[in-house]
Amino acid sequence: MLHYLQNLFQALDVSSLTDAVLRVAAVFLCLTVHETCHGLAALALGDPTAKSMHRLSLNPLHHIDWLGLALMFTVGFGWAKPVPVNPNYFRKPKQGMAVTALAGPVSNLLLAILFLGIGKVIYLYAPYSAGINVFFEWCLFTVAPMSVGMGLFNLIPIPPLDGSKVLAMFLPNSAYGQLMRYERYGILVLLALSWLGLGGNFLGNAIYGVYEALFHIFFA
């Protein structure tokens, strides 16, 4: 994932431009599902903040952070506009935040499974055509691996990624407060790790392993 999108616009022929458009569409889809599911989880736990601010939307423009999107296409990772969550609505704030955070990565894994399933149905039943073949490849080789990558990347326990909020559930309140105090510096840490090339191979192998396992469930 860290370097998946870096060479997106290198060539200018029609086929590569088509591929670029399809990849951008996949990014928008994965980000939108991820952020919307954060809001839905919060709502299910009693927090209406995202709903009242019209963030329970499948319109990607409601979720795109343009700086985060630009970084995604330059350094290989970025972020969306965070869905607002007020933990004061939760009966158990730390646990509520953890469940709300976990909803995003889980939704990405489920989205990958869904699109692998769609690909399987196309493979079994759809008549061949150029358009159907493009959609088939988009489901299997763009949306599914990108969604797996987005889900696993967000499980890294570095603030402000979702994994840090899941980790916080298991920390004492004092340690939780310390972790959240440094949340604003998390993006700088991630940028430094990306620039230094640290962790990329491990994450890439994890993404490939999960994607390959899911792929073989449908195409053994």
Where are these regions (language model features)?
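Hydrophobic transmembrane alpha-helices and their immediate loop junctions
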Residues: 1-220
